[in-house]
Structure formats: C-alpha cells, structure tokens
Amino acid sequence: MAHSVKIYDTCIGCTQCVRACPTDVLEMISWDGCKANQIASAPRTEDCVGCKRCESACPTDFLSVRVYLGSETTRSMGLAY
C-alpha cells in the first residue's frame, strides 16, 4: 500500500530522514529555499511502507516530513505547534 509523504518548508537539509528510510523513498534535491540548499523529496512514495522512521529521524520535531496513512494524518505525539 502506497503512502503519501509530505515535505514541508521547515526542512533543513540534514539528510537524517533519507538515511533512516529502509525503502529509499526519500532523496535530497537542490532547493534554494533553505540554508542547506537542498531539501528532501519523495519521488518513490509507492515504496513507502509507513514505518515513519523518517519522522522519528527528523530534528525539526516532525514538522518537515509527515507520512499520511490513508485518510489518517500523523500526529506529533504531544509536540506543541
């Protein structure tokens, strides 16, 4: 089952999510909108298994990468927005 992976503009280009993904769904692409001049991209969402390791690895408190499982959106597990 494919999942939708949303990348938000709080991405700092650290590559933690890319390295955490067991199915290589994510990759870094050039982007001038952040300090690192790169952002995570999800070109292979059909391979996403919904493990959410990318969310756990994200140092910006789940705000950069969110995995949507069907109609359910992920929750930030008690983090305030």
Curated annotation (Swiss-Prot):
Q: Which residues bind [4Fe-4S] cluster 2?
A: C21, C48, C51, C54
Reaction(s) the record says it catalyses? reduced [plastocyanin] + hnu + oxidized [2Fe-2S]-[ferredoxin] = oxidized [plastocyanin] + reduced [2Fe-2S]-[ferredoxin]
Q: Which UniProt keywords apply?
A: 4Fe-4S, Chloroplast, Electron transport, Iron, Iron-sulfur, Membrane, Metal-binding, Oxidoreductase, Photosynthesis, Photosystem I, Plastid, Repeat, Thylakoid, Transport
What membrane topology was assigned to this protein in its record?
A: Peripheral membrane protein
Q: Where does [4Fe-4S] cluster 1 bind?
A: C11, C14, C17, C58
Extract the GO molecular function terms from the UniProt entry.
4 iron, 4 sulfur cluster binding; electron transfer activity; metal ion binding; oxidoreductase activity
The record's annotation in InterPro entries points to:
4Fe4S_Fe-S-bd, 4Fe4S_Fe_S_CS, PSI_iron-sulfur_center, PSI_PsaC
Cellular compartment(s): Plastid, Chloroplast thylakoid membrane
The note on cofactor binding and number reads: Binds 2 [4Fe-4S] clusters. Cluster 2 is most probably the spectroscopically characterized electron acceptor FA and cluster 1 is most probably FB.
What is this protein's name? Photosystem I iron-sulfur center
The taxonomic lineage of its organism, from the top, reads: Eukaryota, Viridiplantae, Streptophyta, Embryophyta, Anthocerotophyta
